[in-house]
Amino acid sequence: MGQGDESERIVINVGGTRHQTYRSTLRTLPGTRLAWLAEPDAHSHFDYDPRADEFFFDRHPGVFAHILNYYRTGKLHCPADVCGPLYEEELAFWGIDETDVEPCCWMTYRQHRDAEEALDSFGGAPLDNSADDADADGPGDSGDGEDELEMTKRLALSDSPDGRPGGFWRRWQPRIWALFEDPYSSRYARYVAFASLFFILVSITTFCLETHERFNPIVNKTEIENVRNGTQVRYYREAETEAFLTYIEGVCVVWFTFEFLMRVIFCPNKVEFIKNSLNIIDFVAILPFYLEVGLSGLSSKAAKDVLGFLRVVRFVRILRIFKLTRHFVGLRVLGHTLRASTNEFLLLIIFLALGVLIFATMIYYAERIGAQPNDPSASEHTHFKNIPIGFWWAVVTMTTLGYGDMYPQTWSGMLVGALCALAGVLTIAMPVPVIVNNFGMYYSLAMAKQKLPKKKKKHIPRPPQLGSPNYCKSVVNSPHHSTQSDTCPLAQEEILEINRAGRKPLRGMSI
């Protein structure tokens, strides 16, 4: 039978657009939905119009044109004017494996999935800005029970494994948690966020002022020491921080402690809470203050040693600046950008390490050319006494800082220095655009999620019922073997899960 035979032609109406092809074309991909149309009993299993002699599918006509071309040419391309999830659903419906997408279109196809993963990573970002109208009844009031459950899942990833029974806990636990965790959940949550931001800024300001000599006057102190035959008085001078700064820091720590305890108590998932790096920073920044206050009244040598150590580790208080990431989207975007650009940073470090090693060696030997004949070390006239010293100069030069503490003094060394500076500019410039693009992508996604209106009711189409045109066949008289039984076709949702998991289903699977 030739391809030009009228009986070999088949008409497929997809969303009102008629497509004509040959049955032999549809047979090129066995086990798919279109391949079943080429079988003799297809009229009884699909929506077939005998008067128009066509099969009808209520699907996207534009995407189907690309899928049909895949049967004709063997190359699957992704349309640029179709959203990625829609194209993914269409591939699953027609039984096409996503890994068949051509390499030229793979990045376009994957873009939507990367965007979804990025949006999920901003779990603490607000989903709507209309909470002012819904929070008049109480703190963290986000609507009915479904809204509270959605808020809890969005902020805490799961329900509490140790949730307490009773209506009070079930009603107020997600509200109090949102009050301290999500500044955009309600008006009262914004008040808490402003208070937290105020104490963070005050604490950091106090930390900086404590290092100024104006607030560290020198005072004379005496200490009675026990000696072998009695006691003796020892006089010494010591810098002592102004008391009002300590009181201010104490007030800030009281607030941070209250905030931390409330978040611990009302957290739906204690394990996830403990694993969170920001929560670890909160605890580490609070603990030294209480240890210092508790040991300040002791006079033993061990207590004084511990106090001295705690004064040294006061710098951990500056880590509270990272608490601002809960309140500013831009800081969260920066954190996600740094994590997403790990490969680029590693590449930059490798390039710099190679350049530093090469140019430190070159400058060392280049400077030795101008050595005096009576100089046995050949290094009295230059700063570059050895190659390790040249590492510092190479780093400063390649990063275009140029402190000027070390510089070449011979014409050959100057030539190496010029090459080092040019190489540094080119090396740093290569990965920077990728990092900037990542920041722009994450920032736009964060802004999109922040302004995304809350969906009150999501449209979910009815699944295909047995006997409907979109329901796949229960019995397939196909000569092609299948890994599944004909009475258990692979659902469209399962195809989506397989594609997202990166597993490649066999071509013979029933769809």
Swiss-Prot record:
Positions binding K(+) in this chain are: T400, L401, G402, Y403
Q: Which processes are annotated in GO (biological process)?
A: action potential; cellular response to xenobiotic stimulus; cerebellum development; corpus callosum development; globus pallidus development; optic nerve development; positive regulation of potassium ion transmembrane transport; potassium ion transmembrane transport
Coiled-coil residue windows: none
Location of the protein in the cell? Cell membrane; Cell projection, Axon; Presynaptic cell membrane
User: What does the UniProt record tell us about how this protein is modified after translation?
Assistant: N-glycosylated; contains sialylated glycans.
- Keywords, A to Z? Cell membrane, Cell projection, Disease variant, Epilepsy, Glycoprotein, Ion channel, Ion transport, Membrane, Neurodegeneration, Phosphoprotein, Potassium, Potassium channel, Potassium transport, Synapse, Transmembrane, Transmembrane helix, Transport, Voltage-gated channel
Q: Does the record bear Transport in its keywords?
A: yes
**GO cellular component assignments:** axolemma; axon terminus; calyx of Held; cell surface; dendrite membrane; neuronal cell body membrane; plasma membrane; postsynaptic membrane
- Kindly list every residue the record annotates as glycosylated: N220, N229
InterPro entries to which the protein is assigned, alphabetical = BTB/POZ_dom, Ion_trans_dom, K_chnl_volt-dep_Kv, K_chnl_volt-dep_Kv3, K_chnl_volt-dep_Kv3.1, SKP1/BTB/POZ_sf, T1-type_BTB, VG_K_chnl
Q: One short Pfam family name for this protein?
A: BTB_2
The cross-references to SUPFAM superfamilies, in alphabetical order and at most eight, read: POZ domain, Voltage-gated potassium channels
Q: For side Cytoplasmic, which residue ranges? A: 1-190, 268-276, 332-344, 437-511
Q: Which residues carry this modification: Phosphoserine?
A: S44, S130, S142, S158, S160, S474
**GO molecular function list:** delayed rectifier potassium channel activity; kinesin binding; transmembrane transporter binding; voltage-gated monoatomic ion channel activity involved in regulation of presynaptic membrane potential; voltage-gated potassium channel activity
Question: How is the protein disposed in the membrane?
Answer: Multi-pass membrane protein
- Keyword Glycoprotein in the entry? The reply is yes
Positions of the UniProt region annotated as Disordered: 121-147
Q: Where does Zn(2+) bind?
A: H77, C83, C104, C105
Question: Which disease annotation does the entry carry?
Answer: Epilepsy, progressive myoclonic 7: A form of progressive myoclonic epilepsy, a clinically and genetically heterogeneous group of disorders defined by the combination of action and reflex myoclonus, other types of epileptic seizures, and progressive neurodegeneration and neurocognitive impairment. EPM7 is an autosomal dominant form characterized by myoclonic epilepsy apparent in the first or second decades of life. Cognitive function may decline in some patients.
Its quaternary organisation is: Homotetramer. Homomultimer. Heteromultimer with KCNG3, KCNG4 and KCNV2. Heteromultimer with KCNC2. Heterotetramer with KCNC3. Interacts with the ancillary subunits KCNE1 and KCNE2; the interaction modulates channel activity.
Q: What is known of its domains?
A: The segment S4 is probably the voltage-sensor and is characterized by a series of positively charged amino acids at every third position. The N-terminal cytoplasmic T1 domain is involved but not required for Zn(2+)-mediated tetramerization.
- Sequence similarity: Belongs to the potassium channel family. C (Shaw) (TC 1.A.1.2) subfamily. Kv3.1/KCNC1 sub-subfamily.
Described by its record, this protein's role is as follows: Voltage-gated potassium channel that opens in response to the voltage difference across the membrane and through which potassium ions pass in accordance with their electrochemical gradient. The mechanism is time-dependent and inactivation is slow. Plays an important role in the rapid repolarization of fast-firing brain neurons. Can form functional homotetrameric channels and heterotetrameric channels that contain variable proportions of KCNC2, and possibly other family members as well. Contributes to fire sustained trains of very brief action potentials at high frequency in pallidal neurons.
What is the protein's given name?
Answer: Voltage-gated potassium channel KCNC1
- Organism whose genome encodes this protein: Homo sapiens
Q: Output the lineage of the source organism.
A: Eukaryota, Metazoa, Chordata, Craniata, Vertebrata
